[in-house]
Curated annotation (Swiss-Prot):
Subunit of clathrin-associated adaptor protein complex 1 that plays a role in protein sorting in the late-Golgi/trans-Golgi network (TGN) and/or endosomes. The AP complexes mediate both the recruitment of clathrin to membranes and the recognition of sorting signals within the cytosolic tails of transmembrane cargo molecules. The keyword Membrane applies. It is a peripheral membrane protein. This is AP-1 complex subunit beta-1. SUPFAM superfamilies: ARM repeat, Clathrin adaptor appendage domain, Subdomain of clathrin and coatomer appendage domain. Adaptor protein complex 1 (AP-1) is a heterotetramer composed of two large adaptins (gamma-type subunit AP1G1 and beta-type subunit AP1B1), a medium adaptin (mu-type subunit AP1M1 or AP1M2) and a small adaptin (sigma-type subunit AP1S1 or AP1S2 or AP1S3). GO terms for cellular component: clathrin adaptor complex; clathrin coat; clathrin-coated vesicle membrane; Golgi apparatus; synaptic vesicle. InterPro entries: AP_beta, AP_complex_bsu_1_2_4, ARM-like, ARM-type_fold, B-adaptin_app_sub_C, Clathrin/coatomer_adapt-like_N, Clathrin_a/b/g-adaptin_app_Ig, Clathrin_app_Ig-like_sf. Belongs to the adaptor complexes large subunit family. It is found in: Golgi apparatus; Cytoplasmic vesicle, Clathrin-coated vesicle membrane.
């Protein structure tokens, strides 16, 4: 009979009977009793009263019985810690049993019993098991170290288990090596600063050897570990890729994705001119396609990962479009993901095929899917210019179907096509106007109103069409009301004599009859513009619109690089970095792809420009989503856009609505979402000019870098500027805020001094930052633990992170801040020193330095004289290193000391420097090279500040 009989009993009050059976002299009866206890425990009955009786059954040679008792112990030890001590002697004895299965079982169970009192007894048995002659015991003990570290990290370090664990890299058994990697990875994840996975070339060879011989899950641990390694050059990267490539044909999809992750990372270091690079691209496609033959649920994970891969390297799957065509029985989440990938892969070569598919999808019965398909046609028109006419024709065919939701979605996307290709397809406006009465969705109505307002001079009855919307003005959504207001103002500016009454009517409705502050504010702005300077109003309202982006939802490049490093994990499914959804200390390590070598630099993937900055001199681009129309005071009404960030407003605060997206969180009872909200400051398209070159670049003589000796400085802490008054009391109703920025041990802080110069007590403090160039945001709420009495001063260190919303500011290091207390909300702006963003891993390899310096165009080089600096070479190098500006190499030429230095910003931008120091001369010559020239001027200021203080 099977063991299912133990779960079918309906007896009550059997604890006493079980107790008697557990103390029976007959082994079989004991085993039966323990099975009954485990069955009761499994279905939720409390059998903890039997703890001492079950523990007595541990003294047995029967492996099955011992496993059952250990299972019981793991479940009840936490609730009965004092009783669990009874089992320690048996554990210690079992760890020396001749049977390796029992030794491993004992050490595994001891690791699973999370009771502090037992951990100290675990140390000696664990030490022996780590050096056991049997590999099964060693591999079990390796995992036990990670479990023990989770319970008591200090004990593990004091007992030297981490060193023993590291030594297992040389173990002859691949499973032991794999478990060693898994354990160290687990520990390193919870302690990012421990540097446990300090991999070297020799260790990598051992891991690659073990990779071929261990189980599939062990292979995943090893591949993930390989992904954390940084090869010293492209040759080593290619060697690793060659040995990892066979994993692509593995039957386990997790192994395949882990292998893809490693290859995607190391491809960054390979030259595109290599034959091997092209071969690797071809090898990556088939395994990814194979993953899509699974059931819908396991198919969704590869699809989400492929979405990332095609954003980074579309060439991998450019010939596999048909694989992503939707099947009739695909669930909606698979359909939508495939649709998104199809658009990303759309090109002039396959657009006809894609459009035919999308048109077919638009006739299906699933409303959500049909909407997405129609929107996809519009995205194709914007992405592939040659297909725009065909896309518009397809959309008109769909409008002729008169299916309401199809018509409405088509009008929304045609609005975007008009933005992308002005004065090209306006002939279809008449057809759109025929469907005006059938529009009942806010987005479609707003789109139609925008079209009528934008092309009012071409529509004879534009005033009648817009007037028809005014009848139910107060019943419309905010989106439609705002759009109608702007459209009628546009109409008035184009036909002033005929529409004066209409514009007065809408301004009156917006400013006098509306409770919506956004609508009211926009109405007043238009009213003042029109009444004071109609010419200026025309220039503002009818200004030429910026281009909309070809890709509205591409992930920001630095985030994409980070997500590529998390392929095969939950982060790649969420499309969010781990720190965005993992609480506590785990998952906070920021990963990024290695910097591309000079030979591998891609024209279509330039090295990260500063957050929010265009890579070249292109017109400002804004996303085509929601109601983003380029008009004055455009507000965030839809979901956040993940396209290119908007240009920032200037430092002058003026009437900026700083908290246009975050006021709710600041004014509520609790300051939730601190540092997260999207601010709604109106963008002004201000392009940052590259700093002027101050002289011809000095010949750097970098070809001899390989023979140079590194300059080594002493870490003495980053320079901290003295506190300055950021918000005077007279501007903040008695609240004075002074502060400075610091960076210590990899953490950025805003050190604040709050002084109450008012006559009333201040409480309920909260702080919020506007979107800024580097994503600076509070990492925790502003904690003022006691009310701030009159004339009292409090010092606070506010931790910051760089995972906030990004928007390019002018100047680049401008930070706009809102502070709220029980009196009011106050705004100020300050400039943070760029050196607080210099990260600790900013020392570039010499070969990489040489290749990158040569690869960065000469026009990106900025040169500057630092005067009145009395430091010698060693002191200067040491001082700069304390602020994370690292000396890669040093040489002396014609009596001049030349320091070659590198630094890296938090968003992954590298800056290379050549500092020339003439002994006895207080003037230094600094040459900087960076792929983002606008960063250089601020780096020069950082150099000068650090060296002179």
């Amino acid at each position: 009979m099977t063991d299912s009989k133990y779960f079918t009993t309906t007896k009550k009050g059997e604890i006493f009977e079980l107790k008697a059976e557990l103390n029976s002299d007959k082994k079989e009866k004991k085993k039966e009793a323990v099975k009954k206890v485990i069955a009761s425990m499994t279905v939720g009955k409390d059998v903890s009263a039997l703890f001492p009786d079950v523990v007595n059954c541990m003294q047995t040679d029967n492996l099955e019985l011992k496993k059952l008792v250990y299972l019981y112990l793991m479940n009840y030890a936490k609730s009965q810690p004092d009783m669990a001590i009874m089992a320690v002697n048996t554990f210690v004895k079992d760890c020396e049993d001749p049977n390796p299965l029992i030794r491993a079982l004992a050490v595994r169970t001891m690791g699973c019993i999370r009771v502090d009192k037992i951990t100290e007894y675990l140390c000696e048995p664990l030490r022996k098991c780590l050096k056991d002659e049997d590999p099964y015991v060693r591999k079990t003990a390796a995992v036990c170290v990670a479990k023990l570290h989770d319970i008591n990290a200090q004990l593990v370090e004091d007992q030297g288990f981490l060193d023993t664990l590291k030594d297992l890299i040389s173990d002859s058994n691949p499973m032991v090596v794999a478990n060693r990697v898994a354990a160290l990875s687990e520990i390193a994840e919870s302690h990012p600063s421990s540097n446990l996975l300090d991999l070297k070339a020799q260790s990598i060879n051992k891991l690659l050897t073990a990779l071929n011989e261990c189980t599939e899950w062990a292979q995943i641990f090893i591949l993930d570990c390989l992904g954390n390694y940084m090869p010293k050059d492209d040759r080593e990267a290619q060697s690793i890729c060659e040995r990892v490539t066979p994993r692509l044909s593995h039957a386990n999809s997790a192994v395949v994705l882990s292998a893809v992750k490693v290859l995607m990372k190391f491809m960054e270091m390979l030259s595109k001119d290599l034959d091997y690079y092209a071969t690797l691209l071809k090898k990556l496609a088939p395994p990814l396609v194979t993953l899509l033959s699974a059931e819908p649920e396991p198919q969704y994970v590869p699809l989400r990962n492929i979405n990332l891969i095609v954003q980074k390297r579309p060439e991998i799957l450019k010939h596999e479009m048909k694989v992503f065509f939707v099947k009739y029985n695909d669930p909606i989440y698979v359909k939508l993901e495939k649709l998104d990938i199809m658009i990303r892969l759309a090109s002039q070569a396959n657009i006809a095929q894609v459009l035919a598919e999308l048109k077919e999808y638009a006739t299906e019965v699933d409303v959500d899917f049909v909407r997405k398909a129609v929107r996809a046609i519009g995205r194709c028109a914007i992405k592939v210019e040659q297909s725009a006419e065909r896309c518009v024709s397809t959309l008109l065919d769909l409008i002729q179907t008169k299916v309401n939701y199809v018509v409405q979605e088509a009008i929304v996307v045609i609005k975007d096509i008009f933005r992308k290709y002005p004065n090209k397809y306006e002939s279809v406006i008449a057809t759109l106007c025929e469907n005006l009465d059938s529009l009942d969705e806010p987005e479609a109505r707003a789109a139609m109103i925008w079209i009528v307002g934008e092309y009012a001079e071409r529509i004879d009855n534009a005033d009648e069409l817009l007037e028809s919307f005014l009848d139910g003005f107060h019943d419309e959504s905010t989106q439609v009301q705002l759009q109608l207001l702007t459209a009628i103002v546009k109409l008035f500016l184009k036909k002033p004599t005929e529409t004066q009454e209409l514009v007065q009517q809408v301004l009156s409705l917006a400013t006098q009859d509306s409770d919506n502050p956004d609508l009211r504010d926009r109405g007043y702005i238009y009213w003042r513009l029109l009444s004071t300077d109609p010419v200026a109003a025309k220039e503002v309202v009818l200004a030429e619109k910026p281009l909309i982006s070809e890709e509205t939802d591409l992930i920001e490049p630095t985030l994409l690089d980070e997500l590529i490093c998390y392929i095969g994990t939950l982060a790649s499914v969420y499309h969010k970095p781990p720190n965005a959804f993992v609480e506590g200390g785990r998952g906070v390590v920021h990963k990024s792809l290695p910097p591309r070598t000079a030979s591998s630099e891609s024209t279509e993937s330039p090295e990260a420009a500063p957050a929010g900055a265009p890579a070249s001199d292109q017109p400002d681009v804004i996303p085509a989503q929601g109601d983003l129309l380029g008009d004055l005071l455009n507000l965030d009404l839809g979901p956040p856009v993940s396209g290119p960030p908007l240009a920032a407003s200037s430092v002058q605060m003026g009437a900026v609505d700083l908290l246009g997206g975050g006021l709710d969180s600041l004014m509520g009872d609790e300051p939730e979402g601190i540092g997260d909200s999207n601010f709604g400051a109106p963008p002004a398209s201000v392009a940052a000019a590259a700093p002027a070159r101050l002289g011809a670049p000095v010949s750097s003589g970098l070809s001899d870098l390989f023979d140079l000796t590194s300059g080594v400085g002493t870490l003495s802490g980053s320079y901290v500027a003295p506190k300055a008054v950021w918000l005077p009391a007279m501007k903040a109703k008695g609240l004075e805020i002074s502060g400075t920025f610091t960076r210590q041990v990899g953490s950025i802080s805003m050190d604040l001094q709050l002084t109450n110069k008012a006559l009333q007590v201040m409480t309920d403090f909260a702080i919020q930052f506007n979107r800024n160039s580097f994503g600076l945001a509070p990492a925790a709420p502003l904690q003022v633990h006691a009310p701030l009495s009159p004339n009292q001063t409090v010092e606070i260190s506010l931790p910051l992170n760089t995972v906030g919303s990004v928007m390019k500011m002018e100047p680049l290091n401008n930070l706009q801040v809102a502070v709220k207390n029980n009196i009011d909300v106050f705004y100020f702006s300050t400039l943070y020193p760029l050196h607080v963003l210099f990260v600790e891993d900013g020392k570039m390899d010499r070969q990489m330095f040489l290749a990158t310096w040569k690869d960065i165009p000469n026009e990106n080089e900025a040169q500057f004289q630092i005067r009145d600096c009395p430091l010698n070479t060693e002191a200067a190098s040491s001082k700069l290193q304390s602020s994370n500006i690292f000396t890669v190499a040093k040489r002396t030429v014609e009596g001049q000391d030349m320091l070659y230095q590198s630094l890296k910003l938090t968003n992954g931008i590298w800056v290379l420097a050549e500092l020339r120091i003439q002994p006895g001369n207080p003037s230094f010559t600094l040459s900087l090279k960076c792929r983002a020239p606008e960063v250089s001027q601020h780096d020069i200021q950082a150099y000068e500040t650090i060296l002179k203080n």
